[in-house]
Every structure is written in structure tokens, then in C-alpha cells.
């Protein structure tokens, strides 16, 4: 499974949404119904899954599915 698909599975599982709703511009809060705690838990899940630390200042900039895919692809080169 590629990284993008795994990211989408984590989001779908945590937020209880269908993977096909996870377009790159889908916003976690506005489009996918996440609250601030959900977003924190998502960041923690990405950190655990990909064995990476995401600083708070970076996490605050991650607002969409595309943001997290681009961020992780950049950090995990």
C-alpha cells in the first residue's frame, strides 16, 4: 500500500468518513466534521504510523488531506 492510501485510511478510520470523500482539498474541520481533538489525534496517529515527529508549528498548518500528504511526502523523502 502506498503512503497516500495509508494516510487516507488513517483519516477515514479516525473520523468515520468514507475514503472516497478524502479529496486533497477536503478540510478536516469544515468538510470532514473533525473537531480540534480529532485533529490532534490525527497528527498523533501520523507520527506513530510513520515514525516521525510533527512539531506543533507544522501541525497547525495542516488543514486538509492534501496538506498532510504533501507534508509527510516531503519529510519522509
UniProtKB/Swiss-Prot annotation:
GO MF annotation terms: acyl binding; acyl carrier activity
Keywords, ordered alphabetically: Cytoplasm, Fatty acid biosynthesis, Fatty acid metabolism, Lipid biosynthesis, Lipid metabolism, Phosphopantetheine, Phosphoprotein
Main location: cytoplasm
Record-linked Pfam families: PP-binding
Modification O-(pantetheine 4'-phosphoryl)serine, positions: 36
Subcellular location: Cytoplasm
InterPro entries in the cross-refs: ACP (IPR003231), ACP-like_sf (IPR036736), PP-bd_ACP (IPR009081), Ppantetheine_attach_site (IPR006162)
PTM description: 4'-phosphopantetheine is transferred from CoA to a specific serine of apo-ACP by AcpS. This modification is essential for activity because fatty acids are bound in thioester linkage to the sulfhydryl of the prosthetic group.
Example of a GO cellular component annotation carried by this entry: cytosol
Domain Carrier residue range list: 1-76
Biochemical pathway: Lipid metabolism; fatty acid biosynthesis
Gene3D superfamilies for this protein: ACP-like
GO BP: lipid A biosynthetic process
NCBIfam families: acyl_carrier (TIGR00517), PRK00982.1-2 (NF002148), PRK00982.1-3 (NF002149), PRK00982.1-4 (NF002150), PRK00982.1-5 (NF002151)
Similarity comment: Belongs to the acyl carrier protein (ACP) family.
Function per UniProt: Carrier of the growing fatty acid chain in fatty acid biosynthesis.
Protein name per its UniProtKB record: Acyl carrier protein
Gene: acpP
